[in-house]
Amino acid sequence: MLYNLLYPLADQVPLFNLFKYLTFRTGGAVLTALIVAFLVGPRIIAWLRQWQKQGQPIRADGPESHLLTKKGTPTMGGFMILLALSVSTLLWADLRNQYVWIVLLVTLGYGLIGFWDDYLKVSKKNPKGVPGKAKLVAEIAIALAAAAWVWSLQREPLAGALAVPFFKTVLLQLSWFYLPFAVFIIVGAGNAVNLTDGLDGLAIVPVMIASGVFAIFSYLVGHAVFANYLQIHYVSGSGELAVFCGALVGAGLGFLWFNAPPAMVFMGDTGSLALGGALGAISVVTKHELVLGIVGGLFVLETVSVIVQVASFKLTGKRVFRMAPLHHHFEKKGWAEPTVVIRFWIIATILALAGLATLKLR
């Protein structure tokens, strides 16, 4: 909004020339989202506590410590993230850019699905929430609409192509199969972050790390000169997503202030589904879906642990892990919650650096 309102006046007010720089607006988005989260956070938490007298239902089969340390903590803290993210993005992004709207609407759509799930958990006191099939259908519908919208904005051979990391300007042509593939990425990312969100601060920091990396990728992929220099594909207009990513980082930092152990609030599915969907949508726009698998490798590990656990139990009657997702396995082994969280943050950082390395290792 500020870009659309103030940059046209740059001839009269030279200071407004700053708004043409993505780096300036991305920095502004980080700070704005952080400030909004700080301002609205205490009020949102107070409202959630008043509404959710007993807090989020805790799994009876989970780690025993959770029944003591997490009981009574309100959920749906994702409201704080989504509000700060949306306000900051609308202020600092170029609102004529359709990619910004695609990613923002996917984020809010998945947030709405998550809210539906959280609401049922709190109101019905049922940890399972929305039936899995209904939830999946809603996620697929939003992802399919987003993928089709992205397809309509990009020309061949880029539209139906998949970029391959570690190879110079290699694009695999998937044609119409790209649509279900993009849906799989968005839905998978949303649910992967959702599965990871089981400990205080565990999901939000890797999300911020991945968002920071994709701010860089968005900027470079959307800049013709840098894309040519790095021998990566060029997606016109995708650089504006750096502003969205910056807003996500700022909103995440603000939320972490209240989610640091012991958490005052949980993001719930309202936040985790939305943030995962956002990362998936960004990777689809920038054509770096495979890089998301590296940068968000921690989310992949958590998801695979659940798949392996369920498959093993159905096929053999035995469990591979003491409990799934993976972070609960280490808790069951005796690791303290802060130990699990910080070590997983370290893993997320290493994987993010590996993802960044794909820019030069070609």
Swiss-Prot record:
The coenzyme or cofactor needed here is: Mg(2+)
Q: One Gene Ontology cellular component annotation?
A: plasma membrane
| Compartment(s) | Cell inner membrane
PANTHER family in the record, alphabetically? PHOSPHO-N-ACETYLMURAMOYL-PENTAPEPTIDE-TRANSFERASE, PHOSPHO-N-ACETYLMURAMOYL-PENTAPEPTIDE-TRANSFERASE HOMOLOG
A Pfam family of this chain: Glycos_transf_4
| Principal localisation | membrane
Name the gene for this chain: mraY
Q: Which HAMAP family match?
A: MraY
* TM annotation in the entry: 28-48, 75-95, 100-120, 134-154, 170-190, 201-221, 241-261, 265-285, 290-310, 339-359
| A Gene Ontology BP annotation from the UniProt entry | cell wall organization
Name the record gives this protein? Phospho-N-acetylmuramoyl-pentapeptide-transferase
Q: Superkingdom of the source?
A: Bacteria
| EC code(s) of this entry | 2.7.8.13
The record lists the organism as Paramagnetospirillum magneticum (strain ATCC 700264 / AMB-1) (Magnetospirillum magneticum)
- What catalytic activity does the UniProt entry give for this protein? UDP-N-acetyl-alpha-D-muramoyl-L-alanyl-gamma-D-glutamyl-meso-2,6-diaminopimeloyl-D-alanyl-D-alanine + di-trans,octa-cis-undecaprenyl phosphate = di-trans,octa-cis-undecaprenyl diphospho-N-acetyl-alpha-D-muramoyl-L-alanyl-D-glutamyl-meso-2,6-diaminopimeloyl-D-alanyl-D-alanine + UMP
Bilayer topology annotation: Multi-pass membrane protein
Pathway listed: Cell wall biogenesis; peptidoglycan biosynthesis
